[in-house]
Amino acid sequence: MSYFARLPEQFVPPLLLETELLNALYGAARQQHDDVEIAATPGEDVAIRATFIRWFLLGAIPASQIPIARVRITGATIDGVLVLRGARLIVRLCFQLCRFTAPIDLTEATVPGFELIGGAIPAIHADRLTVRGSLLIRAADPAGKDGTEIKIAGAIRLNGATIRGNFDMQGAHLGAELAEQRGYLAPLAVAPVYCSHDPATPEARLAAQRRPNAEDGTREPAIDGRAWVALEADGLSVDGHLRCVWPFHAKGELRLDGCRIGRNLDCAGARLENFGGYTLSAAGARIAGTAYFGSPFHEHADDSHHGRNPQFVSRGTARLDGARVEGDLDCSDGCFFATAFLTGWNTVSPFENDAYALRANGVEVGANARFAGRFIAHGNVTLLNARIGRDLDFTSARLEFAGGEALCCDGIAVAGLVMLLGGQRPFWTNGLLRFVLASIGQGIYAENVRFDRSGPPAPLTQHAFLTEDKRFAKFAVPSELWLTDPLWTAHDRKEIVRHACGIYADDAAITGSFIWRDVAGEPANGSPSYPFWLHLSGASAETVDDDIKSWAEPDRFDIANCRYRSLAGLFEGYRFDEGEDHPKAFASYVKSRLSLLDREYAPRRAERSSLKLGGLALPPRPRKACSRYEAIRRFKPQPYLQLARVLRIAGMDKEANKVLARLESNRTRYGGFYWPNRLLRGFTFGFLLNYGFGWPRPAIVLLIWASISSVAFQIARSQHLIEPTWHNKENLAAKPDRESNPPYVPFNAPIFALDTLVPLVNLDQKENWEVEPMSHHMVEAGTRPFSWRDYRTYSGLLSSAPDRLVGWLIIFNKFFGWLLTSLFAGGVTGLLRGGREPAELPGGE
């Protein structure tokens, strides 16, 4: 049996829709329905008082004892503030295409479910709300048809709320409030910016935020660093999905700090705007499923489907610091704009967050982090100290931060791959990609990549250096990449170039492969605005899979103390032409790598030659581009040692020796030696011994010089400048039949030359023949034999110069012979071999 509460006097007489609502309750009692539904008729009175709805929900329905499950009101205008603070409802509320003149207050209420389908409302205050079912604040038409969206002028407050089902805001249009303001209306000065739903451009809205400064007449941000919030839901708990999908649109911050989502956070196709602030803040959030910030159908979309596959768009800073996503972090097809990259950005009083397009420091992703497809970021994307359970995918992405840091992944740990790959389009960036101290489990794949330096540096980086603003210094390239080079300045003025693009991955640990293929710097022809760098100092990888052309693209690279175990291009990856002689091909391959190393670490040597490999021909850089002091500063031996070690492990000892010989040659030139030491080292160890790898050279030089000397000695003998020694003359006068006399030793010019050159070996020539000037005034005939240790012999020759050239030649041969034989012995034994590569991966020099 049903009982009906008496209508309070304040509602007498009831309005038209109020009467229909009471009649629907009576009808449900008679027909035993569990739904109470009414719909306004256009042209009639569509108003219904909020206080009446409160009495109806908390008084009439409980008193009737009818098991009503849902109350649905369509097309009505709710007049006044609907206050349900602390209420415990037993029915699910549904307002479809209704217009509220004041906010709804659901603070600390408990409801089975709550639905706002289409319509308009100033604000929703529902802190600590408990919803045993789902909370739906969504458009009536999922396709976003005009007139079916839900418009909320102010903010939705759900701090500490609990939703047992889904929280669905598909197609909702949210305005914003000041975070510290408890009212629902924004200030009149900025209300048209955040609370209107006209299709104004972001630039127009940004300009509308600015007001004149009374002191200097300039324009500064009207927000003054204050936080504008569209959804304030710190500590929100949602057991199901949280959906803000297309055509969702918010003009303030979606604040989800510390929230817990049991399934997915889906923002596919959403548009978020908060110039100078956060568009989304989910710091410390816990998401058990996947977080989507892309397009609804990115896996099957291309540019031809752009109209029906909208991108996620964020104009401001999206923040995920410290968040944990158990599934994927999927930003594929997303479009992120930092405030500093929007037209009209104010450089008078900027904020630090103006440079961030996406900030996810310390984020933990259980599966893949995807930034693929049509993903584009205008500003800095930072994943500092992030943890990725599988792959970090930037396939076909575009990262724009001209001359500054477009991507910061310092300290990141990726269990799978880092993919900088081209798909339907190349991976493109005009900024720097940082992976300092990163830990990559399966490798970095950089293939089909374009680094563009055609445009000017970003205004933010120019502002940072012109004003020395320390807030933006972190977004500039490291000082290690600055260049003092006339190639990058006008009229050959040597200025410091503080902008660059490329990859900066010092001390990165790559367990798998580092792939560097099909990489190009743009523009290919013309004058770039800033250099293209590849900085891998101290990094390590198991395998390097590359092509020579890609290494030749960067203007500068640094692989000092870089460690790797193998080069995939030696056998599998490097494809030789059919019928090509493999030893010659290997020699050409290694020569090309040496030329690349010389361009970076021996630049003055590389200036005199061109790098050629197949169809590749790079002209030498002008000599004025690098001074000797700069060449000495840039020289580093470790890259040569590492290459030699890898070649030797691969069984290419001959090529490894060539690399080490080139290293020692460069060490002689750029090791900081003074010019006499350079000349002496270059002649003795370089020319005569090839730094220990040409040990036959001293013997060959000795034989060649012996041949030249033999000609000179033969001429001297014919002119009687070389005569027998005194005991050899006695043998001439002795009787030949006397057995006690030694036999006569005839003169032999080649043997005499060798006898003067080779030490510690007696060939019976220099003991039996002497230079004629040495037999007068210095040695008394018949008294003693000639001794090479007698200093008077040399002083006599010096006093008789220059007509004693044959004697000078003998002295030179003596010293030269000692030098050549010592070098020969040192080369054979390996004592004088230079550039010994380590047996294990070096830790650095």
PLM region spans:
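Pore domain of cation channels
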Residues: 764-842
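Core alpha-helical transmembrane segments of integral membrane proteins
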Residues: 677-770
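Membrane-proximal N-terminal segments immediately preceding the first transmembrane helix
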Residues: 673-686, 786-798
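N-terminal leader/targeting and pre-domain segments
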Residues: 1-681
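Conserved structured core elements
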Residues: 637, 702, 706, 744, ...
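Hydrophobic, well-ordered secondary-structure elements that form the walls
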Residues: 656, 712, 828
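Membrane-interface segments at loop-to-transmembrane junctions
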Residues: 732-743, 808, 812, 840-844
